[in-house]
Amino acid sequence: RKQLNDFLRDTGLFFPIDPGADASIGGMAATRASGTNAVRYGTMRENVLSLTVVTADGRIVQTARRARKSAAGYDLTRLFVGSEGTLGIITEIRLKVYGIPESITSAVCQFEDLESAVSTSILIVQTGIPVARMELLDDVQMGACISYSKLEGYEEKPTIFFEFHGTETGAKEQAETVQAIAEEFGGSAFQWTSKMEDRNKLWQARHDAYYAA
């Protein structure tokens, strides 16, 4: 995944699926991986266009052609994505990629209780705000991340990490709208930044949550 995005960077494109543990593209397809940005970009299920698979008897199967609209036959791509190698070995993958956003903003908001954080998340999704990433950590997990990743300025409280993609104005408006919703449920210490260094540190802490625990 990281190698793919390094290759795509100069083309202005990126592959958005970002699971908690780094993995190969083949492994991500085999396990139908998702990640923090599934709220906007979906999971591997929605982002694999076709596969080449070798079955147990040696047959080579191409699960789909280039035509985007086809109602002929079984949806073999969806069948193999998530099959964990039980139906065949994936040898080639055709993926959907996206344009790198003009602006990326990350934000953090903390809550007094888990119910308020969950209610905030639900309302944000129901409102239709195109949040790129949204990850909820309870107080125990947040405490572990603070200790392990040396996150400064945060308390051991239920916390939501956000990321917004779009134009500079659009990302800012999304962040402000989410902040207003969070404050309705008692959200506090809402902080947002567009600096790459700060964004990377925040999401790296999320990736390291397993080790932090």
Where in this protein do the model-derived segments appear?
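Noncatalytic alpha-helical scaffold of FAD-dependent oxidoreductases
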Residues: R1-A213
